From Swiss-Prot:
Protein's name in the database: Cytochrome c biogenesis protein CcsA
Residue stretches spanning the membrane: 17-37, 44-64, 71-91, 143-163, 225-245, 258-275, 286-306
Organism name: Ceratophyllum demersum
Family: Belongs to the CcmF/CycK/Ccl1/NrfE/CcsA family.
GO cellular component terms given for this protein: chloroplast thylakoid membrane; plasma membrane
């Protein structure tokens, strides 16, 4: 009873803190960035991390098993994973471009877990026989950590595409305006020189230098986080195969969840190939990662919505 009450309190505290953090970020977007508020938001995410950690530990204490047995627990663990990813640049003293992604992601997953699911789904229950294994912690935690990392990396790639697309549109309209407005020979020479600089430096110009630096950082962080998520996903799939052989007598059954996990792995393997290949631009790999964003949600929620297959124990449909 004490642990259940503690879990309830920590749930509301963590959700309240992260809501305030989101509000601070909106204030920073609407007005001038205040250093004190920025630092407060970072500390707020750290406090959220410890609250969710306490929540999961409390649930583990009174349930008797690692809290990854149903959809509610997996969503809370996913929110916890987002907070971990958020803190990595902070403690590394890097500019935290991830906060725009991790903060809304954490509040969305936790908000959906606490308010979007039926109350009955919040209750901890006895593990089904297939889940009564030491592989539960290894397999499911690796998969959820990979989802969090891959989602963050994919959203950074989406942001990269948006900035690149907007710049292409701006350049198109500026060129169209010059062509329709008439210009002298000197202006033609200037336009050709400017076009040459843009082509050779990939958006690097004096006017767009800040935007260029932003796209470089987005591409850098997207690649690093997706690489980490891909590693977690690989470990999760391999550990799941070993667990499946122990529980069902086969390493791979082409279950819907397994099939989509394989598709997810393939998509991000293609991303890593295009990203490390010098013949492809960063926008090409960003397109692949953006496709991966949708595929991850299908992999995570697809089976839960249908309630079929060997992984249906975490579905929306009560068993």
């Amino acid at each position: 009873m004490i642990f259940e009450t503690l879990e309830h309190i920590l749930t509301h505290i963590s959700f309240s803190i992260i809501s305030i953090v989101i509000l601070i970020h909106f204030m920073a977007l609407l007005g001038h960035e205040i250093v004190g508020l920025r630092d407060s938001s970072e500390k707020g995410m750290i406090a959220t991390f410890f609250c969710i950690t306490g929540l999961l530990v409390s649930r583990w204490s009174y349930s008797g098993h690692f809290p990854l047995s149903n959809l509610y627990e997996s969503l809370m663990f996913l929110s916890w994973s987002f907070s971990i990813i958020h803190m990595v640049p902070y403690f590394g003293n890097h500019k935290n471009d991830l906060s725009v992604i991790t903060n809304p992601s954490a509040i969305f997953t936790q908000g959906f877990a606490t308010s979007g699911l039926l109350t009955e789904m919040h209750q901890s229950s006895i593990l089904v026989p297939a889940l009564q294994s030491q592989w539960l912690m290894m397999h499911v935690s690796m998969m959820l950590l990979s989802y969090a990392a891959l989602l963050c990396g994919s959203l950074l790639s989406v942001a990269l595409l948006v900035i690149t697309f907007r710049q292409s549109i701006d350049l198109f309209f500026k060129r169209d305006q010059l062509l329709t407005g008439g210009f002298s020979f000197g202006e033609i020479q200037y336009l050709n020189e400017k076009r040459s600089v843009l082509q050779n430096t990939s958006f690097l110009s004096f006017k767009n230098y800040h935007r260029y630096q932003l796209t470089r950082r987005l591409d850098h962080w997207s690649y690093r986080i997706i690489s980490l998520g891909f590693t977690f996903l690989t470990i999760g799939i391999l550990s799941g195969a070993v667990w499946a052989n122990e529980a069902w007598g086969s390493y791979w059954n082409w279950d819907p969840k397994e099939t989509w996990a394989f598709i997810t792995w393939t998509v991000f393997a293609i991303y890593l190939h295009t990203r490390t290949n010098q013949n492809f631009q960063s926008a090409n790999s960003a397109i692949v990662a953006s496709m991966g964003f949708l595929i991850i949600w299908i992999c995570y929620f697809g089976v839960n919505l249908l309630g079929i297959g060997l992984h249906s124990y975490g579905s929306f449909i009560s068993n």
